[in-house]
Swiss-Prot record:
It is an enzyme of class 2 (transferase). This is mRNA-capping enzyme small subunit. It is found in: Virion. Disulfide bonds: none annotated. It comes from Yaba monkey tumor virus (strain VR587). GO terms for cellular component: virion component. Catalyzes the last reaction in the mRNA cap formation pathway. Its main location: virion.
Amino acid sequence: MDQIAKCIKEGTHTLFPFYDNLPDVNLFLGNSPLPSLEYGANYFLQLSRVNDLNRLPTDLLSLFTHEIMVQENDLEKVYDILNIHSVKSYGKTIKADAVVIDLSAKNKLFKKDRELIKSNNYLTENNLYISDYKMLTFEVFRPLFEMSSEKYCIIKLPTLFGRCVIDTTRVYCSLFKSVRLFKCANDSWLKDSAIIVASNACKKNIDYFMSHIRSVTKSLNWKESNNVQFSILKDSVDKEFIDKFLNFSTKVYESLYYVHSLLYSSMTSESKSIENEYQKKLTKLLL
């Protein structure tokens, strides 16, 4: 419990090694690899609790999260730390300190209003912006289409689960000589979003990678039609890299499981009131 509280209050981060050799890139647009235990068993435990929350009515979810949904200003915190004064998301001719893509649903918890679903057996979709690997689209590589002389490439990831996010991180570890992954205290600890900060570009690897990407997309420039699910590598990355990524993401998912368990207990408490012991623990932990 102390470690979870520390993780939430202080955030967590990791630095990945640089790999001079790109893995075997094989872009396919339209579908993402399916979840598997190889890429994080903790996710499946986490998903059971997410499904419990997912079936509750969204008006109740809004009521119980209204006070604990902090403003997600983790990107701004990163800008301050790195002394970044100007950012851009598009426009190769525009000059900035960093090119930034935010794939998260900022300050949002669910996708649409919904009534109670009587059991998990009737769940047909994930209505929450939590643990949804389908939210990661090929736009995660859009910065490479937009970069010119920017020092940093920054990506707000919508999730930490699945093969695709690990493969993507591994590719970035060959495109940039410094790749760090952050889950900031200023981010929402109801969601599994995180930030990649990449710097010190490796030009030869970027040129090779973009040559392959453009041959598949048949375009020199970014196209909105490419903003779809994707797979990027032919084979799984090495176990050592997967383990290093999971060492980071497991800390996040263990914290989220505890937070979501408190939230679920609060929403289903016998008191039928937002003033209950679980909600008080949540408020103390997140605010």
